[in-house]
Amino acid sequence: MDFSFTEEQVLLRRSVRAFAEGEIGPHVMAYDEAQEFPHALVKLAAAQGYYGVLFPEDLGGAGLGYVEYVIVVEELSRVDGSIGISVAAHNSLCTNHIFACGNEAQRKAYVP
């Protein structure tokens, strides 16, 4: 079995790392010292599609798999654990339940 990352996964890792280091990293200490939740950074991450990694494109998601999801969470968490866990919680704990168990109207309203 080959456990190597695909070319697309390597590119995703580079892209998320560049985003995290460039857009999130410079602000981490300010949010931490102010003891504030980084709402603005969450919006930036959402605009990149990270809050919909696992969900189909027809519902506004990226249509990617769990390996890609872990890459996104890992790279975001390298720079700021709060953003990484926020993305993980949204994809796994919240939206995934609506996607799996909700009706079509709920999916269209709340996913991703």
Residue ranges and their predicted role:
Residues 21-112:
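Glycine-rich flavin
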Residues 11-22:
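A non-catalytic, amphipathic alpha-helix used as a structural packing/dimerization or gating element
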Residues 1-8:
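Intrinsic disorder at enzyme termini
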